[in-house]
From Swiss-Prot:
Keyword Ribosomal protein: no
EC number(s) on file: 1.14.-.-
Record keywords: Oxidoreductase, tRNA processing
Protein name: tRNA uridine(34) hydroxylase
Function in brief: Catalyzes oxygen-dependent 5-hydroxyuridine (ho5U) modification at position 34 in tRNAs.
MF terms (GO), sorted A to Z: oxidoreductase activity, acting on paired donors, with incorporation or reduction of molecular oxygen
Family: Belongs to the TrhO family.
Family matches, as PANTHER family: RHODANESE-LIKE DOMAIN-CONTAINING PROTEIN 7-RELATED, THIOSULFATE SULFURTRANSFERASE/RHODANESE-LIKE DOMAIN-CONTAINING PROTEIN 2
Length: 310
């Protein structure tokens, strides 16, 4: 942690959250953000809290204490990482219908969800021949890294997951009553909500990785873990490697897809303008705009570097 000034905290909690308390908490957090170097994204809804924040340790401590107070000291499922640089541009606080959008209002993860499996017992569960493993993340996240032999629902967003369950899940089950269903995601929130959905639909033996991939990589040494590749994250780092350091991926600023070092060597790739994912998505006028934007970004970087040297 030496030399790393910014503390990054990912958190979530499902609990009944009253609207007046949400509005009050948002106001207090915006005030803290205005007075301090706090950045990140927080989402509040009647079902709880979700988000990732970045700041120096003393500011993070203030925010976490405040969130604990409003969550009535419920478990915030906190995961901590560190960085030399800010990983968000600014602080955003959003009030939504759901803290992670699935679009199934009749489920209640705070009252009914699957069984947590901690990192130490996850390998044993997913190696069991009577277990199927489901990655509940989006297809572009899965392409960056996932667990061995896991099922990819190939969803563009989490709200497509219920349809995949209805259309495809049973085809992967030898026995609906006895097969273990183990699910995982980045930090735990999506797979927890997914277990609530499956229990509502009558599935048995539902498990989810406590703390998600991030906690697993923090707990399990590289030589023993079964995660392959890097873990996509929704901030400037793009992806984290097995040591939870910034990985090798960048973002295509045209389409927002993660691109590897190998992807950047492909003939279709033009920094800030296009990649092989979006080669057919944009017009020539779009690419001209992207090219001009990239030139401005490059000029700004050169200018900042010159100021720093002077």
């Amino acid at each position: 942690m030496k030399g790393k000034n910014y503390k990054i905290v990912s958190l979530y909690s499902f609990f009944p959250f009253q609207e007046n308390l949400i509005i009050d908490l948002k106001s207090k957090l915006l005030e803290i953000g205005y007075e301090n170097d706090l950045s990140g994204l927080l989402i509040f809804a009647s079902e709880g809290i979700n988000g990732t924040i970045c700041a120096e340790k003393n500011v993070i401590d203030i925010v976490i204490n405040l969130l604990n107070k409003y969550a009535d000291n419920r478990n915030l499922n906190i995961k901590v990482n560190f960085s030399k640089k800010k990983v968000f541009k600014k602080l955003k606080i959003k009030i939504k219908k759901e803290i992670v959008t699935m679009g199934v209002p009749e489920i209640n993860p705070s009252e009914n969800n699957g069984t947590y499996i901690d990192s130490a017992n996850w390998n044993k569960l997913i190696k069991n021949q009577n277990t199927i493993v489901i990655d509940t993340r989006n297809h572009y996240e899965v392409s960056v890294g996932t667990f061995q032999n896991s099922i990819n629902p190939n969803t563009r967003n989490f709200s497509e997951f219920p349809k995949w369950v209805d259309d495809q899940l049973d085809t992967h089950l030898e026995n609906k009553e006895s097969t273990n269903i183990a699910m995982f995601c980045t930090g735990g929130i999506r797979c927890e909500k997914a277990t609530s959905l499956l229990k509502k639909k009558g599935y048995k033996n539902i498990y989810h990785l406590q703390g998600g991939i991030l906690q697993y990589l923090d707990d399990i040494p590289k030589e023993k873990n079964l995660f392959e590749g890097e873990c996509y994250v929704f901030d400037k780092r793009v992806a984290l490697d097995q040591e939870l350091e910034k990985g090798s991926y960048s973002i295509c600023h045209a389409c927002g897809m993660p691109v590897s070092i190998q992807d950047q060597e492909r003939k279709e790739y033009r920094k800030g303008i296009q990649c092989h994912f979006c080669i057919d998505q944009f017009s020539d006028d779009d690419r001209k705009r992207f090219e001009e934007r990239q030139k401005q970004i490059d000029r700004l970087k050169v200018g900042n570097h010159k100021i720093f040297k002077d």
